[in-house]
Structures are given as structure tokens and as C-alpha cells.
Regions:
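A surface-exposed partner-binding patch
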Residues: 1-120, 164-168
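Short acidic-glycine loop/turn motifs at beta-strand connectors
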Residues: 125-128
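Short, compact, well-ordered microdomains
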Residues: 131-136
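Short, surface-exposed beta-strand/loop "edge" segments at domain boundaries and coil↔beta transitions
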Residues: 94-95, 119-123, 137-148
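Compact, glycine/acidic-enriched structural inserts
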Residues: 138-167
Length: 168
């Protein structure tokens, strides 16, 4: 269960709140029907090699609140340029093995969350709610929950690269 009030109007910093509202989000947004449809689609998919997705509450909650949103930060970013992203787990539908491999390395279940920059990187969430970015250069830790990950992407905070021992 989340330790914050998802209807609170002061949940995000001003710049993040503005980017979220620009994308169509508002405090209390909750589309469980869409989240359940995504969950069903992921559960039903089996790769040619037999790999399947796992679905868990942290993912469904993130999809229910932020699913379908195209979120873009403005400004120069704190460390790097803000990263536009889309919350839609079906961007990772055909990456069941990749997501499962990350989960094995982390010792937890992981499933797709969305994508950065029109497919430049896959966003994934684990069973504890932690969020990651997977791209051609490696795997990155974006935050301890969806809120922190959104802040990281919208404000241009440099993410931590995952290594064999965890984030650097």
C-alpha cells in the first residue's frame, strides 16, 4: 500500500505537477478498468520461447493512476535533459524475457510500465514499486516508487546505473 495520499494537491514539486497536469493527470485520477485491461493483455501474452509477464499490485496501481499519459518536462533539467515518456505497459509486451531477466537479477518480479522517447528505453516496475529504465546502454534505477521515477524523468535528474551489486 502507498504511504501517501494520491489525492493530495501538494504531492509533486511544482514543475512535475505542471507536467503531469499538462498530460491530463489530476489528483485522484484512477482508471482501474484500463489497468485491468493491460494486466489481462500482459498475462495472456506468451512469447514464442514460452516467456510470460508477471503482474502485481504495484504495477496495476501505477497504470491506474498514470496509464495512457504522455508526460514531458520543460526546462533544461537538473543534470540531463528531461525525458519525455509514455505510461503504457504494452510497449513491453514482446519483451517478457528481457523484463524477467531484470527481475531475476534484482531478485524480484518486474513488469513493463511504459517507454521513454518513442521506444528509446523501456520503463519497468518491480513488485516493490521501484522503477527502472532499460536501454541499449544498460539498466537504470529511476526511483523507489512511481512518484520518484516521474520526478527523475521530468526534472532531468541523472538516474543511477544498475550494476551487479545494485545502483552505482
Amino acid at each position: 500500500m502507498r504511504a501517501f495520499d494520491r489525492t493530495a494537491t501538494d504531492r509533486f514539486p511544482v514543475a512535475v505537477d505542471a507536467a503531469l497536469r499538462e498530460s491530463g493527470w489530476q489528483p485522484g485520477r484512477w482508471d482501474i478498468k484500463a489497468a485491468e485491461n493491460w494486466a489481462d493483455a500482459l498475462r495472456a501474452h506468451v512469447s514464442p520461447a514460452g516467456h510470460r509477464h508477471t503482474v502485481f499490485p504495484a504495477a496495476v496501481e501505477a497504470w491506474a493512476e498514470f496509464g495512457g499519459l504522455h508526460i514531458t518536462g520543460s526546462g533544461p533539467g537538473r543534470h540531463i535533459a528531461p525525458t519525455p515518456f509514455h505510461i503504457d505497459p504494452l510497449h513491453g509486451l514482446h519483451l517478457a524475457r528481457t523484463v524477467a531477466d531484470l527481475g531475476r537479477a534484482l531478485g524480484t518480479e518486474v513488469c513493463p510500465l511504459g517507454q521513454e522517447l518513442d521506444g528509446q528505453a523501456l520503463l519497468a516496475i518491480d513488485a516493490h514499486g521501484r522503477v527502472y529504465s532499460l536501454d541499449h546502454t544498460g539498466d537504470w534505477y529511476l526511483g523507489s516508487d512511481i512518484d520518484h521515477a516521474i520526478r527523475t524523468l521530468v526534472t532531468g535528474v541523472r538516474p543511477s546505473r544498475l550494476s551487479a551489486t545494485g545502483p552505482l
